[in-house]
Amino acid sequence: MSTIEERVKKIVAEQLGVKEEEVTNSASFVEDLGADSLDTVELVMALEEEFETEIPDEQAEKITTVQEAIDYVTAHAQ
């Protein structure tokens, strides 16, 4: 079983079409990885599915970097 961090990074790479090595913890989805608003919505949906959790819209808007996604999932995943 891979760690939450590894799983989040794999999902980010797949959803945004970037190489996994480009997905650093400090990477911004929009500024560093080229995501647009639709990409970020799809990314949140993929994270919800992978970790069987719901991310409310007001929380999803605050998740702008890989580390923020890891932190949220770590705190809320089942």
Curated annotation (Swiss-Prot):
Pathway: Lipid metabolism; fatty acid biosynthesis. Its main location: cytoplasm. The keyword Protein transport does not apply. It is found in: Cytoplasm. GO terms for cellular component: cytosol; membrane. It comes from the Bacteria. GO terms for biological process: lipid A biosynthetic process. 4'-phosphopantetheine is transferred from CoA to a specific serine of apo-ACP by AcpS. This modification is essential for activity because fatty acids are bound in thioester linkage to the sulfhydryl of the prosthetic group. The modification O-(pantetheine 4'-phosphoryl)serine is found at S37. Keywords: Cytoplasm, Fatty acid biosynthesis, Fatty acid metabolism, Lipid biosynthesis, Lipid metabolism, Phosphopantetheine, Phosphoprotein. GO terms for molecular function: acyl binding; acyl carrier activity; phosphopantetheine binding. Residues 2-77 form the Carrier domain. It holds the Pfam family PP-binding. The keyword Lipid biosynthesis applies. PANTHER family: ACYL CARRIER PROTEIN, CARRIER DOMAIN-CONTAINING PROTEIN. Carrier of the growing fatty acid chain in fatty acid biosynthesis. Belongs to the acyl carrier protein (ACP) family. This is Acyl carrier protein. It comes from Ectopseudomonas mendocina (strain ymp) (Pseudomonas mendocina). The gene is acpP.
